[in-house]
Amino acid sequence: MNFGYFDDEKREYVITRPDTPAPWANYLGSPEYGALISNNAGGYSFARSGANGRILRYIFNQFDQPGRYIYLRDNESKDYWSASWQPVGKDLESYKSECHHGTAYTKMLADYSGIHSEVCYYVPLNQTYEVWHLKVTNASACERNLTITGYAEFTNNNNYEQDQVNLQYSQFITSTVFETNRIRHIIHGNLDWVKEGEEVDNKLAISRFFALTGAPVDSYCGDKESFLGRYHGYHNPVGEENGKLSGEMCYNENGCGALAAQMLSLIHISEPTRLALI
């Protein structure tokens, strides 16, 4: 069974079937800001240390989730899919995709329902943030009213073990706020005696953010449970089913960054939208 090939000229490994027997991953970034991304956009990011500088959550020994997810929704038909095959997982008879793992970048191409999308994930040189750059082309015979939603799931603690095991404490110290075009995730911000950037009793108040550029934010959500919904998952979040995000923020729960933008896609016109994460 053939899942891909090496492109020697472009120095890429091209995955032509997304249903690989295991996650096939690539490394992005530098020792200052690193990221791991699979062919279905699963993976995590970290600052300096994968153990003690974790930013995006990733659960090992599960199903390559969560990840750097971009959802596309047709507001007329209410159908939605993802720029990578997972997490929505559309039937591969109608959903076509490729993943290009290159040196310090990963590109994902997808075609579904007359819409072509290209997303490139990379860490800019000498920077401590990552960029998800999305380009959408309408290849159908009519105008399309689309909503694009980016989703990132933050860790509640820099230490990955504390984040996934010591939930009573790690949820207590986390919160999110919405600011213009970004969701800011704050750790230890509810402790009055801890100032941002200053360490007190091994506690450090820090912020991360998930921001949208290239289009105004139409709706947003900073709480994981509110975005996904009870008894739902990454493949069918209620935020996508409803067509508009709840606007709910996180306080002492599990934080996330979910930002949605509406776009009217003209026939055979590409409209780039960029999602940036730090």
Which role fits each region the language model picked out?
Residues 1-266, 270, 274:
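Anionic coordination/interaction segments
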